[in-house]
Amino acid sequence: MKVSIIGTGYVGLVSGVCLASKGHDVTCYDNNHEIVDSLNNGVPTIYETDLKQMLTNVLKEKRFAAKLISNETYFDSELVIIAVGTPSDRGEIDLVYIKQVSILLANYIKSNENFVAVVVKSTVIPGTTDTVIRGIIEENSGKTLGQFGLGMNPEFLREGSAIDDFMRPDRVVIGHDDEKTLKL
């Protein structure tokens, strides 16, 4: 399956490399060209046990690539994962990146005839996926939920054991509104 991941921080990069190592074709998007270049050269931008070797392997297998995101990005995937940061200086969640990404996804969904599932892994408060992200996508794509999929899959990764946590999770939590998204 083709998977796009928006964000190459801890959650996005670990998820992308692990999914690629499981045989999926993964493209991770970031707005920082230095991060994109580093990843495409096999140099992870975070430290995690075994991540460098796994990244090297999936790059050789051509199952992983990093690309610069822009307003014209066409994701070419049936599954798009949002893994952007939500921190603020005030200690509360800042949804500015979530909102920007939701507009980009709305444009992609609008121009795509196929079903696209959007899954949120970013740290957000309950209700954000359904109210903020869904609202932006529906308003800007002209499509309603069901014509695209929407889900939430929070990550429980611990620094230092994130690869193992992803590959052998002790729990998986999935919120979804349709069976197609759940199956992906």
Q: Model-found features: residue ranges?
A:
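Structural/interface elements that position substrates and couple domains in central-metabolism enzymes
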Residues: 1-184
